[in-house]
């Protein structure tokens, strides 16, 4: 089905207000969920909203909590999210990293005791729109087996890197081949995954999203490489924030809350003049996209460039929402 941005935001807002969330907070949170969905990231927008409300109802998310600064060390700051709303707090933390970068050339905010930030790419994009390089990542509950294991002991720990090119170039990727959100998107659409995304119950690689969702044997990105990246990203976020690791979140909490996150902004213009920056970025993009195609019908893509097209299509034609997901939201 198709819905407008206004319908989507109103639906989110209604549910949030019914839970006693303050009017201004509910409006800002509903706006972010709707913008994420409008941008084409359904997995971490509309599809994720019922799960967000479940955690709100369970008390994992404290809607009136505010992040609190703990430590300042020049360009580095450490904050405690105090289990506030994840996407609103993440936006504030990247804003703060940008402010630090304006003063120091680089800014780093390490956040502990945070909630799921929904679409991580929103915060990298936020920095790149202002002319900064944006880098951020989060740890999570253990939802992926380390390479060579059957049991989930590491997080998908998504990493975002956004570059202020025209259009913005951005990698937004979990350390698994697919996020659980994208497994859901493909299952709801009745599609197999384009490449292997995990293991079946017999230990064979599979493209069936529903099987992987059920047995939780998701495949690390690049096999042992994604497994290793997940571990070191967790270590850095834990140390810099003095927060909880994947092990602590998984073993000590009843659900995925109290995670650790990193937000970095770099002011490129302190290092290179604008025309030179733009020319260098354009040369990189042209060099990549003019490579001989392996398939004449398949364009060579640059990461993140599709979001501009998806946003325009959704604004023109309406936002696609799965019927079953919309029914869940209406029932909340």
UniProtKB/Swiss-Prot annotation:
It holds the Pfam family Ldh_2. NAD(+) binds at residues 168-174, 224-225, 304-306. The keyword Transit peptide does not apply. The keyword Cytoplasm applies. The active site is at 44 (proton donor). GO terms for cellular component: cytoplasm. Its main location: cytoplasm. It is found in: Cytoplasm. Homodimer. Belongs to the LDH2/MDH2 oxidoreductase family. DlgD subfamily. NCBIfam families: PRK13260.1. Catalyzes the reduction of 2,3-diketo-L-gulonate in the presence of NADH, to form 3-keto-L-gulonate. This is 2,3-diketo-L-gulonate reductase. It comes from Escherichia fergusonii (strain ATCC 35469 / DSM 13698 / CCUG 18766 / IAM 14443 / JCM 21226 / LMG 7866 / NBRC 102419 / NCTC 12128 / CDC 0568-73). The lineage of its organism: Bacteria, Pseudomonadati, Pseudomonadota, Gammaproteobacteria, Enterobacterales. The gene is dlgD.
